[in-house]
Amino acid sequence: MEQISVIAAGVCEQQNMDFDAQMKELCSLAEACGLCVAETFTQKLSSRNPASYFGAGRLLELKERLEELDVHDVILLHECTPAQLRTMERTLGAQVSDRTLLILKIFA
């Protein structure tokens, strides 16, 4: 059975000292779900964009990266609102899940 490839993505907020460890944990959670992390994708911001999680320019860079790698799934470090997930899925043309959904898949 072929593994699904994903991009693990997160926003590093200024006050987050454990960001690298959190991203490693996200990758481990993905692997526990049988996913293959093709790449990590990050952005440093003072706070997450309330509409789209990433800034608009960085979101378009993520879209380009998905196309280059032929990856159709993104997992996010932080819990997102349904509106953020919809905006990202519409912009990226990819399935987007947050950390909480990933954990629920492990225990399903």
Region spans (language model):
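N-terminal accessory targeting/assembly segments
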Residues: 1-105
